[in-house]
């Protein structure tokens, strides 16, 4: 999963997403400072660029997902309650950000389709905050029936470690969208995941 970093223009972002679309399974649109109109314009660009709606996840903005026909919404830890959204819009897939085992269990209880756990490693987007490490993933995988994705400081060299704790997937932000060559980085992550799965 590639997660946008809210640091680029809509046009720049659209070009990067279209370019990397075949190297990632999902693209999470996490543009907190953009207006509704800007994000809707971005989604129009992606549609014109051939990015399947099934690959797109909208962060937090339920209204945008509903208006654009996007089927997956990712809710922040302090965002809308999963259960309430599921009851009102049962056709949507819902992801939830969590930072510990109990948060993940509660998200699953409320009906989340997956959880995004972090931050796993030190990262520039969380400067000064101690990473949560990988141990909670091990705990989650023992009891959760929904997929657990890992985020935060994810680098190609760390893919194997995440595979070893049975994370179902990874989410990468700056490692792709802040990279000088996003397509090359996305391709490297894809190759690392494929190699880890062969072991």
Kindly label every feature range from the protein language model:
Residues 119-120, 133, 153, 175-176:
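Residue-level preference for alpha-helix termini and adjacent loops
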Residues 1-114, 139, 145-146, 155-160, ...:
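Conserved N-terminal beta1-alpha1 strand-loop-helix module at the mouth
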Residues 63, 135, 171:
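Active-site phosphate/pyrophosphate-handling residues
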Residues 26-30, 116-122, 170-172:
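Short beta-strands and strand-loop turn motifs
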């Amino acid at each position: 999963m590639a997660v946008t970093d809210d640091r680029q223009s809509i046009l720049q972002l659209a070009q990067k997403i279209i370019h990397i679309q075949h190297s990632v399974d999902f693209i999470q649109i996490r543009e907190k400072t953009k207006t509704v109109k800007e994000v809707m314009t971005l989604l129009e660009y992606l549609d014109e660029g051939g990015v399947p709606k099934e690959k797109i996840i909208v962060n937090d903005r339920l209204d945008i997902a509903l208006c654009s026909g996007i089927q997956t919404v990712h809710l922040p830890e302090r965002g809308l309650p999963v259960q309430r959204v599921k009851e009102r819009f049962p056709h949507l897939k819902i992801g939830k950000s969590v930072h510990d085992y109990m948060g993940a269990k509660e998200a699953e209880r409320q009906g989340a389709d997956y959880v995004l756990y972090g931050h796993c490693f030190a990262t520039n987007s969380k400067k000064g905050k101690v990473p949560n490490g990988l141990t909670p993933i091990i705990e989650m995988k023992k009891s959760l029936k929904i997929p657990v994705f890992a985020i935060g400081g994810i680098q190609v060299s760390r893919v194997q470690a995440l595979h070893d704790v049975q994370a179902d997937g990874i989410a990468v932000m700056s490692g792709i969208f802040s990279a000088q060559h996003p397509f090359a980085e996305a391709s490297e992550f894809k190759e690392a995941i494929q190699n880890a799965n062969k072991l």
